[in-house]
């Protein structure tokens, strides 16, 4: 009869909780045991609970953690909840409940589901990012950022007090743009720029100017930035949260508008974030995603002088509070960054981002109405929508022109939505012959397309409208009219139509043209990054409050660390105001603060959901410490995380933000490692069950029961002439393909569920769920139970099928090979092949009348990380009083790893007629005798003459007969 998995699993889950079986030892308790920190990306506890895809990574880390404990490691394997965020707040508003209440309910459900799966977490370390005792330290880390700056000389964060001392001591000076730089000549500062003083000393600045300088250097600062504002949600959204001009949550309209936001200066760490990737044991595609997000580019900044319009612009810019008078714009220029300065001679127009501040200053009145209409249109679109490759190019001529610095050619200036203010300088030189977007734009607006790099013949022939021309005709045609070709040539080649660099290969042409720009004062070498500073504030209630006070001028002051945590006020009305004023602004008693006779207000924005997840791995190390965010001795013992497992959807932002915070904490001496996560693995997505559609003029959905397999595909059972396609999709409530682990565990048990998820395929692979396949793992576990226990009535402490006796030699060898292979596979996260080895060994065990105790115990120990409940029960029934959670992993005998026998196919005249099993050290003569006597061979050689006997060593025997 089947074993009673429900009773057994509840019994052992309760045992593990009561006995704290998986408690990680503190450093002082661990002795010489090696440490292993195994971490999951902790979940956001949604109201829907877990579906079967979520536990895949949790099960993988659980198996590794259990295996490492059995190998004598001190394992830290914790779990917690990333519980702040917009979805919780939206649900609370929708249901008229407080987000804290719904969050607590969701956490309780997630905890129940996770414990139901037998995951070996140290529950004494459970954390919740919405707990004031947790976000007290999130606020503390923010203060470290606020009170620090990035020293470009040391390439690290330093206390802001150090910067002030350097300025007061006049080792540093302040540039005209507010930047801080080394004082090149403290004694002769007046001579730095002749008679004109360029830099200023600290003592020469007014107090408000000094405050502005320091604010401009902090790692946490405020700035007026263009954001995706969603009035319906009452908050700013990231680009990833906006689709076709609407919010991903709720589908509300989104508009671009400037707003005061908190920013974190992650760009200062771009080089370190990039270079330190090389030493990490992460998947290469994931590292490449981070490299691309950081986007380091080498090239040049080039200055294009603007030709003053015939009619000067007269306007007052309300945002800047300044008036533009006649003549003021005579020396304006536009700076662009380009990675291809060698194509400068091919720049035939310029494009500014619609938000570029120069647009107002260079646009004459005749063009202003058109420009403003286009800018309004662009403001309704997210950056992601604007950058979509497939969309048609749009733009408007400003009425102004610029001078190309290498050939003095007059070129028009446009604005277009495919240029973004946040990338580079917010302006580009357009080289349509050698950039695809510029090429499409130039074709649409009938702008010149001038080739300045010659492609190879293969490209010319592939993209020419006349591919049958000879090589000379192709190159001549390209020189004369590159716009007639199918697309832009974006590769390297030889410079053409470029007097200063004619005939040079691309690399040398770049170097020469930059030299020329620097000689002419028209540009210089530069390195830029796609990475932008991190927009760190949200206009919502359910998030960490900033530990910041604002005076009447809007200047920011940190609260003292003794005041932390700044707790969220209790509010019954936390709905968004529909304006940029966040919900917290309605808590007037909480907002307004009187300090030393001065009136202050609390910052009413809250931190983004990323904040709590940036450092949670550190709090797990020391979750109950009220004096420090982590004890330094414990941090030094446990860090870095040895194995971090989570979804690829967090490949960029979460990991990049965590690495940034960690590096700041490292620079300031709060942590001991420069990187947080040594090894990272992304589990593959488990898709919903396969869906079937007919392939016909009007496709229709059909059930699996209506489908038949035909060759490598499917057909409709009732009409085999109609082909059927199978496809799997990501699980979602909207699609109706969500499978709950509660249902699977109820019907099959947690151990069967765990084994099935791990047996579906490689951990990193994407794979479809199929409930019908689970029965295979259920049969396996029931077979294990029958082979070792016999039936459910076996008494505790005794067994029906286990004996004290030796293991048969062949099975002993297989057992030793299995111990080695399963251990290696678990360490390498190859769980599907580990399970396959156990299935094979169990099949051989089933051939025995009774199971020798050493085989039974070793098999149970190997099964334990994968199916822990049934393994614990069998272990106890084998007579052991203590849990096997910390039993030693079985050792294998090296001398027994080799096979004692080999199986050889026997051919007669080249066709296999039988197989024989012979000792691995048998000589050729005995092998040939055995082969000739095999029953399957005898019927083919009887009465015939064997002309030749062939033995291919270790491979086969072939008998050649008349």
Where are these regions (language model features)?
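Basic, alpha-helical terminal appendages of large translation-related enzymes
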Residues: 1-33, 353-356, 365-368, 448-457, ...
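Conserved oxyanion/phosphate-binding beta-strand-loop segments in alpha/beta enzyme cores
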Residues: 1-39, 69-78, 102-108, 282, ...
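Residue patterns forming the tRNA-binding/recognition surfaces of aminoacyl-tRNA synthetases
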Residues: 2, 15-19, 94-333, 427-563, ...
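Long, charged, mostly alpha-helical binding arms that flank functional sites
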Residues: 3, 86, 97, 101, ...
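N-terminal catalytic cores of NTP/NDP-binding nucleotidyl/phosphoryl-transfer enzymes
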Residues: 26-103, 127-138, 338-339, 405-441, ...
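Catalytic alpha/beta core of large soluble enzyme barrels
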Residues: 61-62, 74, 356-454, 483, ...
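Helix-rich, typically C-terminal accessory recognition domains appended to large enzymatic cores
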Residues: 82, 153-159, 216, 220-228, ...
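Flexible, glycine/threonine-enriched loop-and-boundary segments that flank and lead into catalytic domains
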Residues: 285-335, 380-409, 413, 534, ...
